[in-house]
């Protein structure tokens, strides 16, 4: 496994592979890797000839400096996981490498997909995501890029970003990996106590209840949201950020629960903010 810390080394290796006719797959991460990331690596390896993983905690996407400071780091463990999963190259830049002149004063937006969910509750977050992704794509020049659908809005934004700017990259969304009890795997879970982990299971329980209500024939989104919210309100440890039912393609509000549907929740368990979602396909009557 090759480990690179500067973009020129990555570009040189990628160009060599491409000259050999190899297709490049890319999984950008912020490190503290877990089995959810490992699944992305496996999906990448199954489709691409060479797999590149980046590990970089991007300061531009944190609207809370304290959240950035507390983001967990385990570089040694991350490299071991990448090697065990047969990743070909790990790009391990520092902040000065990605932003040599500081974080630039440029704003990247896709307004139609940034009217709700995390774009509202974390202002500036996705602008920072699009900024770093544009730079990483420039450095790695992948044919495929893989993103987990736990961060569903991010996946949609990056896919639309590539389409709008005609990046020759196929953006592939991968299903959320969960614990045996249903908790979506996240690097932030490491900051939860055992009691908080138990309480956090209510997020998935709420989503599944919403799914069941919709498939039982309920068409009113407000009614389903109230039923879902009751589950979360049963815990004094959960502070709801948002609970939304939207069109899964456009993120527009729904008046009738038909077609492609996204159920999305963000909530604080103690000091830790967790997100999760389900997507459903309901026949249009």
Swiss-Prot record:
Binding site for beta-alanine: 61
PANTHER family assigned to the protein according to its UniProt record, in alphabetical order: CYTIDYLATE KINASE/PANTOATE-BETA-ALANINE LIGASE, PANTOATE--BETA-ALANINE LIGASE
Protein's recorded name: Pantothenate synthetase
Source domain of life: Bacteria
Main location per the UniProt record: cytoplasm
NCBIfam families named among the record's database cross-references: cyt_tran_rel, panC
Pathway it works in: Cofactor biosynthesis; (R)-pantothenate biosynthesis; (R)-pantothenate from (R)-pantoate and beta-alanine: step 1/1
InterPro entries per the UniProt record, alphabetical: Cyt_trans-like, Pantoate_ligase, Pantoate_ligase_C, Rossmann-like_a/b/a_fold
Substrates-to-products reaction catalysed: (R)-pantoate + beta-alanine + ATP = (R)-pantothenate + AMP + diphosphate + H(+)
Stored SUPFAM superfamilies: Nucleotidylyl transferase
Broad enzyme group: ligase
Positions that bind (R)-pantoate: 61, 154
Catalytic site: 37 (proton donor)
Gene that encodes it: panC
Species of the source: Leptospira interrogans serogroup Icterohaemorrhagiae serovar copenhageni (strain Fiocruz L1-130)
Keywords per UniProt: ATP-binding, Cytoplasm, Ligase, Nucleotide-binding, Pantothenate biosynthesis
Function: Catalyzes the condensation of pantoate with beta-alanine in an ATP-dependent reaction via a pantoyl-adenylate intermediate.
Subcellular location: Cytoplasm
Family per record: Belongs to the pantothenate synthetase family.
Known EC number: 6.3.2.1
Additional free-text comment from the UniProt record: The reaction proceeds by a bi uni uni bi ping pong mechanism.
High-level lineage: Bacteria, Pseudomonadati, Spirochaetota, Spirochaetia, Leptospirales
Residues the entry annotates as binding ATP: 30-37, 148-151, 177, 185-188
Listed GO MF terms: ATP binding; pantoate-beta-alanine ligase activity
Assembly and oligomerization: Homodimer.
GO cellular component: cytosol
